Amino acid sequence: MGDKRATLAEAMATVPDGARIALGGNTLHRGPGAAVHEIVRQAKRGLEIVKTAGAYDVDLLCATGCVAVVSAGFVGYETPFGMAPAYRKAVESGVVEAREHACATVIAGLRAAIQGVPFMPVAGLQGSDLPAARGFRAVADPYSDAQVYVVPALIPDVAILHVQEADSAGNGRILGTRFEDVLMAQAARRVVLTAERITDGAAFAEAPESVAIPGFLVDAVVSAPGGAWPFSCTPHYGYDAPYLASWVAAAAEPATARDFIASHILTSTPVPA
């Protein structure tokens, strides 16, 4: 499969303005933090972000003007940090369009993309306002004539995922919960992996069952020790609570958010403490 290694800047330079990007991880865990920071530094514009449950990644990209649309089931920090202030301001002001989902409808859309079908049935939407809010349609089950809601295929242009280990051919190993990363890799047109370490491919050949993301799906792999930060990355580090608390406080107002971004991201490459 060849050597797919690239620098972080090279890999993110292949992401065009207006792309639909699926970001791996979930809330504050194993998100592609280094890649998100590089997207900010490269001043991408007009992006659509796809994620079941986003937090710092979506919040920061909204604060920096990178995002036009967010398709997600949830955006917020949970834990002690509360809501995502920059995301909320961007949506309330009309700068960002929130395409509301349930986490299950994001997953169903990705599965439709994987299977090459235009839509996927989803149970459990009856009685909610989500179909009306999003225009999800109901169709007749051909076997029972019961009405079932379906969601359209959700095809990311690029999936950006952080893994604990990868080899130069792009095979990626995830330790712990995989979240929706495997679905994103299978559904996307292109895949970029960032990895805590690049290891000898022989280790993957000896235990192929440990490969979560096969190299034939991957277009670029980046050596990025600490590349999930400020998200957690089991078993290497937890999420950076002091940094996240500082960001959430700064993100409450556009001026303080700009100052934070200028001092912590644009003029430096953050690394885990």
Predicted regions and their residues:
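Conserved alpha/beta enzyme-core scaffold
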Residues: M1-A273
